[in-house]
Amino acid sequence: MSNVPSNLKYTASHEWMLLNADGSVTVGITDHAQEALGDLVFVELPEVGAHFDAEKEIAVVESVKAAADVYAPIAGTVTEVNQAAADAPESVNQDAYAAWLFKMTPDNVADLDKMLDAAAYQAVADAA
């Protein structure tokens, strides 16, 4: 069973989000996603300063068996990327929640209220 921390918000496409004290949002892929992909070998991160609409491709993670797009969970501007995750993709396998991919400033922080909570995401992951 996947680890689904209760303090995060989730998407049905297996991204997690954490609202930070400064109003930014940290984003990564879920434990379920990294388990399904297997050993990650490549992480492509977005450009800092780039704006993305919700549900648009923002990053790519590749494993030995598949490549998967990572989608912007909400509309916003990328403010920081986790270069350590790109330099060591296996870190995402080791701890998907510590090895975040990027941070963004949301266009509308209220959009987070539309995301799945841990229980709802667990139901999605269990059905996958």
UniProtKB/Swiss-Prot annotation:
Record carries keyword Nucleotidyltransferase: no
Job of this protein: The glycine cleavage system catalyzes the degradation of glycine. The H protein shuttles the methylamine group of glycine from the P protein to the T protein.
Quaternary structure note: The glycine cleavage system is composed of four proteins: P, T, L and H.
SUPFAM superfamilies for the chain: Single hybrid motif
GO terms under cellular component: cytosol; glycine cleavage complex
Cofactors demanded by this protein: (R)-lipoate
Record bears the keyword Transmembrane: no
Organism field: Dechloromonas aromatica (strain RCB)
UniProt modified residues of type N6-lipoyllysine: K65
Family the entry assigns: Belongs to the GcvH family.
Ranges for domain Lipoyl-binding: 24-105
Pfam families in alphabetical order: GCV_H (PF01597)
Protein name stated in the entry: Glycine cleavage system H protein
Biological process, per Gene Ontology: glycine decarboxylation via glycine cleavage system
Keywords attached to this entry: Lipoyl
UniProt remark on cofactor binding: Binds 1 lipoyl cofactor covalently.
InterPro entries: 2-oxoA_DH_lipoyl-BS, Biotin_lipoyl, GCV_H, GCV_H/Fam206, GCV_H_sub, Single_hybrid_motif
